[in-house]
Structure formats: C-alpha cells, structure tokens
UniProtKB/Swiss-Prot annotation:
<dbReference type="GO" id="GO:0022625">
    <property type="term" value="C:cytosolic large ribosomal subunit"/>
</dbReference>
<feature type="compositionally biased region" description="Basic and acidic residues">
    <location>
        <begin position="125"/>
        <end position="148"/>
    </location>
</feature>
<keyword id="KW-0687">Ribonucleoprotein</keyword>
<dbReference type="InterPro" id="IPR036373">
    <property type="entry name" value="Ribosomal_bL17_sf"/>
</dbReference>
<dbReference type="InterPro" id="IPR047859">
    <property type="entry name" value="Ribosomal_bL17_CS"/>
</dbReference>
<comment type="subunit">
    <text>Part of the 50S ribosomal subunit. Contacts protein L32.</text>
</comment>
<dbReference type="GO" id="GO:0006412">
    <property type="term" value="P:translation"/>
</dbReference>
<dbReference type="Pfam" id="PF01196">
    <property type="entry name" value="Ribosomal_L17"/>
</dbReference>
<comment type="similarity">
    <text>Belongs to the bacterial ribosomal protein bL17 family.</text>
</comment>
<dbReference type="InterPro" id="IPR000456">
    <property type="entry name" value="Ribosomal_bL17"/>
</dbReference>
<protein>
    <recommendedName>
        <fullName>Large ribosomal subunit protein bL17</fullName>
    </recommendedName>
</protein>
<feature type="compositionally biased region" description="Acidic residues">
    <location>
        <begin position="149"/>
        <end position="162"/>
    </location>
</feature>
<feature type="region of interest" description="Disordered">
    <location>
        <begin position="125"/>
        <end position="181"/>
    </location>
</feature>
<keyword id="KW-0689">Ribosomal protein</keyword>
<dbReference type="GO" id="GO:0003735">
    <property type="term" value="F:structural constituent of ribosome"/>
</dbReference>
Length: 181
C-alpha cells in the first residue's frame, strides 16, 4: 500500500512535489548541474540516483519505469545511452551537492547539485600506485643495464677498472641532472 512521504512537501501537494522532482531531474540530466535550494537538492539526490541506477540496468522494464517519472524522451534516451553506461562501474554516489551563498531576495540557502564526472577515487589511486611502482622498477633496471654494458665491453682488468670509474661518473652526472629537473 502506498504511503505518503513523511515531512514537509516541496510546493504543497504530493502531486506538485512529484512534478517538481521530475522537472529538477530532467534539468539535471540535461545540463549536468543545476542551482536550486538546498532542501530541493537534498530531496532530488536520491530520486536522481535511483533513476541512474535504472539506466545502468538498461532493459525495457527499467526504461518504462523511468518514463513514468521523466516525460522527456530525449532526456531518457541520453540517460540510458550516455549517463547510465558512464556509471556502470560505480555503485552509487552519482551526484554531488555543493553549498553556495544564499539567494539574494529571500536569503534561502542555495546549493548546486551536479553529476559526478570523475571516475571513482579508488581507480585514480590504483593508477597512481601503478605509475609509482613502474617508476621504482625502472630505476634499478637502468642501473643494471649500465653495469652489464661495462662488463661486456671490458677485455682486460685494467680496461675494466677504467670503464667502471667512467660509468660511475656518468651515472652520478645523470642523477645530478635528474635532481635538477
């Protein structure tokens, strides 16, 4: 059995609240970010995230469920073809609310609600770790190559000692140049 939403409604009646949320969600999916009151943004956030979750599933049933709430077919098409697949590997947290200064006329607290366009923080951290580990792996490999070259080119012990000293000086100069950069 349907139960009414608890708490104050945006705009008075429940039908007006549904219309406000549908219009706000349409604007959010169309523009990527909207500026509204903080209360409307907080109510819109779970509403929009549920619609994005439907879009991630992408089947006909979920498309019809979204069309019950959002009447603009172009926005629904963009939601299912662009927004849903973009968040395919993300489990929730599709929107972000940023508080901004109060509205000039009535001093209402305002906020910007936007779709998160960055990939997850963990994937960025994993990429940074991979880059750091490859840099660490490359540094010892370069030193090993210098030693191998010295061993191959030396024919006698005296030549080897001179070449090792020359290679060490070259390696020190290269390290100093890297530190300056």
């Amino acid at each position: 059995m349907p139960k009414p939403t608890k708490g104050a409604r945006l705009g008075g009646s429940s039908s007006h609240q549904k219309a406000i949320l549908a219009n706000l969600a349409t604007a959010l999916f169309e523009h990527g970010r909207i500026k509204t009151t903080e209360t409307k943004a907080r109510v819109l956030r779970p509403y929009a995230e549920k619609l994005i979750t439907h879009a991630k599933k992408g089947d006909l049933h979920n498309r019809r469920e979204v069309l019950k709430k959002i009447r603009d077919k172009d926005v629904v098409h963009a939601l299912f073809e662009e927004i849903g697949p973009f968040y395919a590997d993300r489990n929730g947290g599709y929107t972000r609310i940023i508080k901004v200064e109060n509205r000039k006329g009535d001093n209402a607290p305002m906020a910007i609600i936007e779709l998160v366009k960055e990939k997850t923080v963990t994937s960025e951290a994993d990429r940074a770790r991979r880059v750091a580990s490859t840099k660490k792996a490359e540094a010892p490999a370069e030193e090993a190559k210098v030693e191998e070259v010295v061993e191959v080119e030396a024919d006698t012990a005296d030549d080897a000692a001179a070449e090792v000293e020359g290679a060490a000086d070259t390696a020190d100069a290269a390290e100093d140049a890297d530190k300056k950069d």
